[in-house]
Amino acid sequence: MTSFAQTLRNNATVPERILWSRLRGRQLGGFKFRRQRPIGPYICDFVCLSEKVIVELDGSQHVSEAGYDARRDAVLRSNGYRILRFWNEDVTRHLDTVLETIHAALFQGDMDGRFD
């Protein structure tokens, strides 16, 4: 699992690279994020372990994977994580809004789900 996570880190999509450039190094409110981090049997795009907030970026393929994503999210939520999902296009077109939403979620324990 760890070597696959490393492969994903080395082959990040453009939206993943854009978002990582703004999350890395505690740039967002001083919170530490990790990318392509294994949590249980899943690899999460980005996670702030201290706040148990997972950020997932979804491309067009996720429309057909909605059932898998729902099961995956349920397992992660049952372990205390909150999942924020954004479309890749949101990162490339509305990065500031995505960052504001993530920042707010780090301080508000009830934010969870898809943000369109």
What does each model-identified segment do?
Residues M1-K32, S78, F107-D116:
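Solvent-exposed, charged helical/coil patches
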